[in-house]
């Protein structure tokens, strides 16, 4: 055992042991409590960054701790391998996306191995492998057969240069992020999955997720956006269809002075067909992508269509406007405007000099309608038969009136829209559908799955390469045998990441999407990832789990029992990025200090949920601590080996009750730290675990070894320390555990038990304050009387109370504090 801590040698030795013993490969065991720990799998970008190191170390620490508790732990790893970066790399570097992806996976896997994470590598999966996405295609067809999948025209962001759909995030200042072209709003045919059919369950089952952050659950509630309101029907002059609008405030219906529709609403297009000015307005809105978050601050613009609607109660005509603040994707794409009681409608009315009709009277306050809208509830006025009703009552009465007159109905509305899964890209899972002129849409037969991406394609950067690949596109209809074409869209990559956690449980299953192993392992007991995934990925995964449940593939309602959302890694107060020049390279860190130092620092520097501020001095401090632990263990190696031999031979019993006072006191501290650290591990508060380990080490390194009992105490304490540190710094703990003669490998050692008798103490440390200021401290017996404690306090604080009158002595037992109040 070398006196000098060499992390590279230590870590190589530990990793070779784990690899040789297949230490982290796991199978189902009904005799053990299972624990499935999973960090969100990475996109293979080519290199790990410090955010990765923090995220995956968190998961590994949790998995190793749960294993030490005796549970059957699964911790897999894989690759979210489809996506736009690989396709862009293919265009730029003239290499196939698959080649670029495989190269990146190999590089990142090497980095993961160096970190020492306890992964079951036999379960490794890659979403771009046909054996993975085959079952995604199979499941999509099952959903199609159930009516949960459909294809329809939808308005999208279209890049006319790249000839592809862009996500909202890829539109920068109205231009395509790559081509720089002005983005158009274009209607094309898209595939959708009916997530709205599960909206109510997705919302209600959030209440069962007790171990999810409240913030994430609220974000999902807001995204689903359930509201109870009224659907109102307006007849339109010279137009065949009624205009449907949704409102949560039917009590303001009598104050509606105009209607507004979205720029891509069918009625707007109808008006534009014979009104040049309306068409010009629609054209001016074509390249503008309006995000919902921008509605409050953007300039409100519109134009009168010249068409009118009939108020369902008064029969009066209301002008219909096209407005840029009405979005087709929310509600029905039409709103009734009540300027007196909606601020957005009021601003629009002021700009275009439209009428403002007050129909709600504030209760006990005055309001100036020339300055703003009044948006709260009140008493109805100017509302004919509904006058003098409170808003709460009027909502019900007016809704009933509309229902009785076939002019509306009570309804529940959701902000959530069906999930559009089509992407006009190559590097994704092919959608397994065939389009036949005679038969329509026909699923690819199961026996022909997977539909594999062709390799003989050209990456020009314009349009989808699949559309130009005749061998891929031209097929025979499986239903009628006539010539047909294959669907050339690929899946949104969120589809792959919505079910991968379940496939990890069934790796190697070639004949089914999932098997009974998925029912054993799911739900995931602990899921770890960034809060930026709160809505999209986490919502889609919850949805997919319910779809798989209803197909009989899993038997739980939710995919992830507990969720930990880690904070970002910052340097100089900013997120690490190449452009800011504040990136820390994990490879350099591991080469210099070792993986254990990197792991220790990222666990110690901050609670998991908070941002971590990088500190070079903090890294050096973590490394110094590990060197001290190594040196101390080396210094006492022979003694510790002898004690181990005594214990293994049955001669290592110590009666701690008969030990001397100083040993009892130190042992009390060690077991106090053990109890607190175990509690902190259970709450994922690893920074305080590390702090406790440092206190424990200081206690034993300062302890004077004088008796045989002292040796057993040091042995017991180092055993506890190494097991407390092992989930966080597994390599050094593995080597020290073996070299100090402990039984088994430390990964198979049970979690240390708190000796409750050690927590009991004969003595208590008290601090003495004089007029609230700390002046002294002393040790007293646990059964000391109040009089004895006060006398001891006076004695130890003598210099501060002499020549003063002690007016009062206050004892605070739970804080072990005595405050002497002097005059």
Swiss-Prot record:
Gene3D superfamilies: 3.10.20.590, HUPs, Isoleucyl-tRNA Synthetase, Domain 1. A motif ('HIGH' region) lies at residues 42-52. It is an enzyme of class 6 (ligase). ATP binds at residue 578. One of its GO terms (molecular function) is ATP binding. Its EC number is 6.1.1.4. PANTHER family: LEUCINE--TRNA LIGASE, MITOCHONDRIAL, LEUCYL-TRNA SYNTHETASE. HAMAP family: Leu_tRNA_synth_B. This is Leucine--tRNA ligase.
